[in-house]
Amino acid sequence: MPALGRGWSVGTEVEFEHGGTEVAVEKETEETGEFEQEVERGGEVALEQFWVQKSFNKHLNVRAGHIVVPVGMTNNGHTPNMFFSVYRPEGEKTIMPCTWHETGISVWGKAGSWRYEAQLLPGLNSNLFNDQGWIHNGSASPYEFRPANALACAARVDWSGIKGLRLSLSGYLGGSNNNDIVTDPNGKYYKYNAVVAIGAFDFAYKNQWLTVRGNVDYGHLSDAAAISARNKNQTTMTGNPYPHTFVGEGAWDAAVEAGVNMLAWSKTKQKLYLFGRYDQYDSYVPADGLADIGWCARTVVSGGVNWCPIPEVAVKAEGGVRLLDSQYNDEPFFALGVTWTGFFIH
């Protein structure tokens, strides 16, 4: 985060997509509105954060640009040294955008043991909501730009008044209907707001021996039955980006993980954590009149090892099982990962 002087600074986070995973969709209005997929962006550099900040004092800072939305534990701490699992915690990354980043403005500051942040952002796109991931895809525009016909706000408060302990509340509120490149003011679904409301609590406790983290998230979508009907009847034209599924009126997640540092007794600066993790979530709580979808409720139990030879590097191994309703097969898994997290500050 280079400092520019007089309280000005700039920050950025860059992601290198080597696999050609980024594909853009274009809507050709002169060709009967057909969708075309363009792969020119594939394999390019993705910009996850880029902002300019003015700091007046520790109590008041104003940040504008492409910023992270700190709703939930994982979005607030999305670097791999902030969780034990090889992949990002499953519940939060399933039901919410993760890492959630938007172009907007943020006001934040600190006072004693408290830290606050409030943001003004573009709303999500309910055309991209689905049963498997609730609003997860709502912030990731398939186009080469991000429509912003609706506004939203997010906020977070952290308290760290006890050594090693952090308690946090965060939330989000914003409309999501008619926030696409094409809207129909005369259509039967135009009148709905499809307001997304999320409330989240998370905590972390860390000392020399023990690290414990946990979170509870609940989200509600107004007009979910109407949005589900609209999404099921979206265009099926070749190349369209829409999932064509129902979307839940609600979604929730609760998770906890704990790790013991087996090297805490020694003089080494290395860390070797043995950890366990429990995650339960449901990405589809149906609106009245809509049937439940059993496989959307999942429980994940896992455990493993994190070895940190230096603070920036973690070698991770994790094994576990994803438990579903009795009519579905449970899903055992094993994962290995090597992570590096570093910050360049000038």
PLM segments and residue spans:
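Outer membrane beta-barrel
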Residues: 1-126, 149-154, 158-167, 249-250, ...
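Active-site rim elements
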Residues: 38-39, 92-94, 140-144, 244
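Loop-centered beta-sheet repeat module
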Residues: 126-128, 133-180
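Outer-membrane beta-barrel pore domains
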Residues: 29-40, 50-53, 164-346
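Short aromatic-enriched loop/helix-cap "lid" or pocket-rim segments at secondary-structure transitions
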Residues: 75-78, 129-131, 181-182, 227
